[in-house]
Amino acid sequence: MVAFFSKATKCGNGHLPADLRFGGAVYLKPSIGPSEAVVQRNSMDKLDFQNIDLVSEINKRRKAMATRDETITKKSGEGEEMLPSMGMDHESPSKAHLMVPPAPPPSPADAADINGFSFKIWEAGTSVNSDFNSWKANVSKFH
C-alpha cells in the first residue's frame, strides 16, 4: 500500500493545510495506521534535512578554510598587486609592523641643567648617564 503525504505539517486543529504539494511516497505496513505513517514520514524528513544541512555546512566550511589558506599562504609579491596605491607619504599596512618606533624623549635625569639647577642621580654608586653609555657601547658591538 502506498500513501502520498505533503511535507507540510498539520494545522493547530489537526487537519492538513490546503497546500498539499507532492512530498513523496511512504510505504505503509498493514499494522501501521495513517497517523503513525505521518509521524514516521515527518521524522524521516527531519533526519534527511538535518543531514543535508550538515553536509552543506561542512562543504561551505571546507571551501572557506581552503580559500583562507590560499590567502594566507600567498607569496608577499602576489598580495601587493591587489592593494590600492596609497601615495608616497603613506606606508602600506603590511609594512606597518616593520617600522621602528621613534626614540623616547630624553629623561630629565640626562639633562645636566634644568632651570639653573644641576641634577645628578646616583644609583648603587654609578650615574644613570654612565650606565646608559656602557649599555650603548655593548649594544653597538652587535650592530
From Swiss-Prot:
Residues 66-78 have a biased composition (Basic and acidic residues). It comes from the Eukaryota. Residues 65-111 are annotated as: Disordered. This is Myocilin opposite strand protein. It comes from Mus musculus (Mouse).
